[in-house]
Amino acid sequence: MPVSNLPNQVAVLPTGKVVTPTAAPGSKFNPLSTGLRSDGNADANGAVATAVSPDGKTMLVLTSGYNLNFRNETTGANLTYPVLDPVTGQPSSVTTRKAEWVFVYDISSEQLVKQQQINIPNTYNGIAWAPDGKRFYVSGGIDDRIYVYRQEGNTFVPDAPFILLGHNSNQTAPFPAYDGGLLNGTPADTASGGLVVTGAAVAGLDVSKDGKTLVAANFENDSISVVDTASRKVTQEIKFFTPGSPVATGEFPFWVTVVSNKNGAATKAYVTSQRDDEVLSVNLATAAIVRIPVGEQPNKLLLSKNQSRLYVANGNSDTVSVINTGTDKVVQTISLSRPGDRYRGAIPNSLAFSSDERALFVTLGGENAVAVVDLGPQKEKDNDNDKEKGLLDELFKFGKPEKPAKVVGRIPTGWYPNSVSLNAKGNRLYVVNAKSNAGPNPSNGRTTAAGQARNTTFRNEYNWALEKAGISTIPVPSSFKVLDALSRLVDLNNGFDQRGKEDFMMKFLGHKIKHVVYVVKENRTYDQILGDLPVGNGDPALTLLPQPISPNHHKLALDYVTLDNFYDSGESSGVGWNWSTYAATTDYTEKHQSVLYGNAGFNGLTYDYEGTTRNINPGLPQTSSQPSPITVRVTGLLDPSGQSSILPGSKDVNGPAGSGNWNPNVVGGYLWDAALRAGKTVRNYGFYIDLAYYNTSSGQVDPTKPDPANPLYLPISPTPFASKIPQAPPTVLLDKTDIYFRGYDMKNADIYLFNEWLRDVNVNGLPSLSLVRFPHDHFGNFGNAVAGLRTVETQMADNDYAVGLLVETLSKRPEWKETAVFIIEDDCQDGPDHVDSHRSIAYIISPYTKRKAVVSTRYTTVDFVRTIEDLLGIGYLGLNDANANPMSDVFTKNANLTPYQSVVPGILCKAPVDPALVPACQDPNAPKTAAVQSRHDGDWWANATQEFYFGVEDRLDEEKFNRVLWSGVKGDGAPYPTERSGQDLSQEREKLLANWHNS
């Protein structure tokens, strides 16, 4: 069975999990429909927060996700929206394609009724009511402002002036300048000419009981702003951390809760700090701060009605911390794990009380569920006559919060729930979730059978744009019996029934395989590369990079195993690298990535998913007596005085729990952490490298030479070790990284990377786990890529041949008999696929891999990581991989040691490719494909992509880039793919391919 939507609103996800959002009796699931298109293509993504009005009759739903670049389904014109003047609240002359939303629902009856939808260009999680229910406030995210809306009749209207927080310049413009981040005005900022500065971003906010004070978390400035709501002015900014400070505290403040006195005036604010794993208690009169350690990566807060207890959702710890607000001490930690389970991954990320506060409901983003927590001692079970009293009467009685609290059940939801609220009666849950399956059908109807949906003209087909948010209305379960059944379903949906099952193939191979080489590539779907295979379920009409350009991808699939039902779990690189390195994500990533790629457009927020934080490498020290890109952070190079130092310590704000901890008793972290805990050896080639030194000042600069306009630039060298030019400032595995193996850089050649890998392996040998990055199938930097690799076709061929050479080399080494090569794309966001936008290529190559086989078992990135763990005999990292299935169907117990023979893509053997790049081109005996011609030359590609930035993966309009790729390779007259059938095309392949060749 492929990843798909099934009848009865059941969905199989690319993470390997199943969601059943309407399983609870009486529940309903609806998309967050905007009504802008009849096919739902412009419906909302990324529902992140709910807020119920003080009278309990109205609920707000906020999105912060990928909500832009949609088109009119008839004309194809971009859907645009007026940007409000922040001073007047009136539409300005500026319009935008950005469309975050506030949905206003009437929840006063049993029916959920949408009353209004309000467009806001940028948001980031924060939304709060005024205590009289006549106004609400919305954080404007990267726009560094807070929007205010007031009730006027039955609708809410802009209530200007909006609250300008004052970090970014040009604040009163419809859009500010995005320059107000933490490093603004520092010596490093001055020395870099503004290159290291990022923008500000406002996240959570809350309002005092008298409505006079609002407090907002400045997510990228490590501070809170205190606002007088009457004047709309910031009265003070309380800074937790400033550049140059030696103590890490209050960094990445996310959520805010305000405590008020008996008169309703604000007295304290509690703020979660996501990097420092703490809640800050801030006295608003004196600015005194108490630091309260809690669990890892805390996110949302919930204050009891009497304000005596504060509940903290700890996303990376699977716990809830309970703080006594009188003493500012943690008095209880509630585990959300199953009894005795040491693995984490539930990801608690929002909280709500029952009306009497006897129960706590916690959304579990990682389990697609809501946990039900008894906050007091569990009542003795009564006889069956008790079951009619309702869940709360049956299960709970009021108890002091200091008494042990426990999870009594879980309720299934949609994919990645982000917020839960209750109606006034307390008998109905409202849960919003972030996303849904993208599916083969761009209409993305939840119950549309595969093969029936067609891609309407002018759709945005980017995978983030296809994953839609939803809202579930769930009656509180009527009895423990019902809750128990739902809990068992949540366990089943998350694979707990697979836990502990012995796999005899893995047990056998665990004694055979001693070396795993893990290769991660970039962004291609199955159909883009392998749609033209003579076997498997591929659509040749969608094949962009066929066999002559990617012969080794094709030959490896045909010689070993074709995996035609494999899915990358992540949508894009940030999420994809999380899944590829630890089989999970964090709540930070899930909230952050879609906004960064979407409406933020890499402004304000930064790419914090591969070891760097705020574009800084926390793995290196702040200063050094011998400063270089390998010994010190970029801020230390720019400002040796230390005045510009930020992020004290080595913690990565987005690292998984357990990362960097090699104690054998610890679980979690990255794949390499588990290997090192098990006593294995690890060598890193290109994973998690600081990319700050790879950008030339223009696309015309020779990348093999120093850049006079950018003294930080590290030149590319085909022989970096011999030239003594370190290429790779590592963020992790500092002493286990080949610093001459360059990280992600589209100007570089993957064949250069292969040559450096080979040099290092010949010197240091083959470790237990090798981490190898070959990124050139991402494509880019066509203006000044090295070695004449200035077209998509030549860059793909470069990537293909590097992969082929690596497998050939390994298959001829003495260790081959106990080696396995795993090759995966981190994500497959950059192209079409007729089955699902997450379906991609993957390979497992070893002496024990089946030969000339097609394996159509549904596998995902999580299964891939799980299989590596099983072969190496190392510990699992979290719930996902511990519950996953190893990819046993790929293997046989009969070893075949026949070495692999790589094939030279013929396009690499002709101008303008550097003749020195591939010596085998001169070998008449070397297998080669026909030397196909690139449809366009490098100048065409440079011109067609001149608006795109390739210095960091995905920092561009991916949908537009995909269209450039298609027309550039297929030709301007080739229609962009308009149909994804979802059909099984594995039969009658010869006829299908003949029709394709003749078309």
Residue ranges: model-predicted function:
Residues 467, 483-999:
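N-terminal pro-sequences and low-complexity stem/linker regions of secreted or lumenal proteins
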